Amino acid sequence: NVETPHFQNMRRPFGKLKDILQPIIAPVHNTVEEIISRIGLKPEDIDFICYDHLHTQDLRKWLGSFEKPAYFPNAKLLVMHQEWEAVKDLLPLQRNWHCPFGVEGIDPDKIISLHSSILLGDSLALIHTPGYTQGSQSLVAHTENGLLVCSHNGISVDNYTPELSTIYG
């Protein structure tokens, strides 16, 4: 999220060029809204959302707040208890990595605070994977091609299907 102080600090030295350089340095290929529409879902079809951790996230867009309606009106956030408690009471050094007011005004009933890993059906699990943050979590799916783990360090298709990668090495 560009409102996160860390990213604001990175953009500041570029002055007026920052908006010109943004699509070159960090292009946006798709938005959540575009993908939801493309696969034939409506925002009200989404029941749950989750993140590997809450750095840089402004959850108000998706879950709503006292001032703004939710893009996903029926969705609840699945989040590890440690992560949720930390984001509500950030230490000064942590604030640089969090969107200002990113959880402010969210209805507490939209938060499902988990104390351990959980199964989400027969072939999907949300696993507590502390390390990067105390509340980091990873999605693990059992697919016809084996296990697929989606976590913090998976940032491109090459991370998830290295056998198809065109990156040398």
Located regions from the model:
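Metallo-beta-lactamase
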Residues: 24-41, 71-128
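Conserved beta-strand hairpin/beta-sheet module of binuclear metal-dependent hydrolase folds
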Residues: 1-34, 138-154
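Active-site environment of divalent metal-dependent phosphoester hydrolases
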Residues: 53-60, 85, 133-137, 157-159
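A short secondary-structure junction signal
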Residues: 60-64, 87-92, 137-140, 161-163
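Short polar/acidic secondary-structure junctions
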Residues: 118, 130-131, 142-144
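Active-site metal-binding motif and surrounding structural segment of the metallo-beta-lactamase
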Residues: 17, 21-75
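Accessory terminal helices/loops
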Residues: 145-146, 155-169
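Active-site neighborhood of phospho(di)ester-bond hydrolases with catalytic His/Asp-centered motifs
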Residues: 47-53, 78-80, 127-131, 149-153
